[in-house]
UniProtKB/Swiss-Prot annotation:
InterPro entries, alphabetized: Kinase-like_dom_sf, Plant_Ser_Thr_Prot_Kinase, Prot_kinase_dom, Protein_kinase_ATP_BS, Ser-Thr/Tyr_kinase_cat_dom, Ser/Thr_kinase_AS
Name of the protein in question: Probable serine/threonine-protein kinase PBL3
GO CC, one annotated term: plasma membrane
Species this chain originates from: Arabidopsis thaliana (Mouse-ear cress)
Lipidation (N-myristoyl glycine): 2
Gene that this polypeptide is encoded by: PBL3
Tissue: Strongly expressed in leaves, moderately in flowers, and barely in roots.
Keyword terms: ATP-binding, Cell membrane, Kinase, Lipoprotein, Membrane, Myristate, Nucleotide-binding, Nucleus, Palmitate, Phosphoprotein, Plant defense, Serine/threonine-protein kinase, Transferase
Family listed: Belongs to the protein kinase superfamily. Ser/Thr protein kinase family.
Residue positions where Phosphoserine is found in the record: 250
Lipid-attached positions, S-palmitoyl cysteine: 4
């Protein structure tokens, strides 16, 4: 029923510029917890490497992917109980996300509570640009398979309706865990686990022969499964990396204010190092518990990067930017290593930033390093809190002037500087 359009439109490696209002809420794909998760029966036989990823492809080729289920609109209506309000998981500029149920074998709609739970993203009618962003996501997630990329189960295209069906991520987004009022604070170990998983996802995209630049790496697009394994979602802004002797891709400035690399904002020249910068911002959010942009703060403190950067290379002052909700329960050496890594990722000179594979290696090394016993006297060691393995966890000093409830205010996306196009930001 109209699931595959016969069109010559291509998802091209250099010129498409999807609009900025869609897919800003993939972070809320799974804001409610469910005991049901996507079983192995939904594993998609897509590329585990993008070495031979065929681009550009026609729309017909993309939508005829054998890896995806072509749902009818009626099937998804049944799966979500006619998109009822009590099935709504979240909404944003792009549209709405609903909780749905499908049979694990046939992938047909099933009764609520039976089969497996999925997240159904229903896009608003946004015309050609909205369709292009939707198609870009189908193109990439329909071909790629990796433990740290969210799994796309299928899609629906009928008339003006554009929907995507994903595996359900019961722990929701990293953004919600860090910034939502009342959320339980993440432990140091979980924060590093999330960072490592996200780094694995980006490394997979960057190191492929047919490189993919994610272009919208942020806490809202990092989804978490029941064990806090992180997966990248929302590939609507993804771009094919430079080929041949090219060093960058020239494109209209798109992304999210506070996460976008400064050289990309200024020139429109996109490289994998742009993603590295964005990763540095998210790593900083994990360390500090503060948003990339917070308009409720004053002056330089509105920008997390501007505010935190002076402290990242100073062991004695690093505690000033650490999330007070950690209660000082983090290894000082590990925190300094992570902060130093964030500082490298945020280098204003893109060429001096590390590759994501190098970032991942550092994080893996950090996770495998056991916390030391510090330099305190014997009594201090006895009184020190201990981790699950019995090792002493350094309790870093608190900056009590920051011990107040965080303001959970969604930052507005300020206009970014332009080069020769008017940027669209989320």
């Amino acid at each position: 029923m109209g699931n595959c359009l016969d069109s010559s439109a291509k998802v091209d490696s250099s010129s498409h510029s999807p609009h900025a209002n869609s897919a800003s809420l993939s972070s809320r794909v799974s804001s409610k917890t469910s005991r049901s998760t996507v079983p192995s029966s939904l594993s998609i036989n897509s590329y585990s490497s993008v070495e031979s990823l065929p681009t550009p492809r026609t729309e017909g080729e993309i939508l005829s992917s054998p890896n995806l289920k072509a749902f009818t609109f009626n099937e998804l209506k049944n799966a979500t109980r006619n998109f009822r309000p009590d099935s709504l998981l979240g909404e944003g500029g792009f549209g709405y996300v609903f909780k749905g149920w499908i049979d694990g074998t046939t992938l047909t709609a099933s009764k609520p509570g039976s089969g497996i739970v999925v997240a159904v993203k229903k896009l608003k009618t946004e015309g050609y640009q909205g369709h292009k962003e939707w198609l870009t996501e189908v193109n990439y997630l329909g071909q790629l398979s990796h433990p740290n990329l969210v799994k796309l189960v299928g899609y629906c295209v009928e008339g003006e309706n554009r929907l995507l069906v994903y595996e359900f991520m019961p722990k929701g987004s990293l953004e919600n865990h860090l910034f939502r009022r009342g959320a339980q604070p993440l432990t140091w170990a979980i924060r590093m686990k999330v960072a490592i998983g996200a780094a694995k996802g980006l490394t997979f995209l960057h190191d492929a022969k047919s490189q993919v630049i994610y272009r919208d790496f942020k806490a809202a697009n990092i989804l978490l499964d029941a064990e806090f394994n992180s997966k990248l979602s929302d590939f609507g802004l993804a771009k094919a990396g430079p080929t041949g002797d090219k060093t960058h891709v020239s494109t209209q400035v798109m992304g999210t204010h506070g996460y976008a690399a400064p050289e990309y904002v200024a020139t429109g020249r996109l490289t994998a190092k742009s993603d590295v910068y964005s990763f540095g911002v998210v790593l900083l959010e994990l360390l500090s518990g503060r948003r990339a942009v917070d308009k409720s703060k004053v002056g330089m403190e509105q920008s997390l990067v501007d505010w935190a950067t002076p402290y990242l290379g100073d062991k004695r002052k690093l505690f000033r930017i650490m999330d007070t909700r950690l209660g000082g329960q983090y290894p000082q050496k590990g925190a300094y290593t992570a902060a130093s890594l964030a500082l490298q990722c945020l280098n204003p000179d893109a060429k001096l930033r590390p590759k994501m594979s190098e970032v991942l290696a550092k994080l893996d090394q950090l996770e495998s390093t056991k916390p030391g016993t510090g330099v305190g006297n014997r009594q201090a060691q006895i009184d020190s809190p201990r981790g699950s393995n019995g090792s002493i966890v350094q309790k870093s000093p608190r900056r009590y002037s920051y011990d107040r409830p965080l303001l959970h205010i969604t930052p507005g996306a300020s206009p970014l500087p332009t080069h020769n196009h008017s940027p669209r930001v989320r």
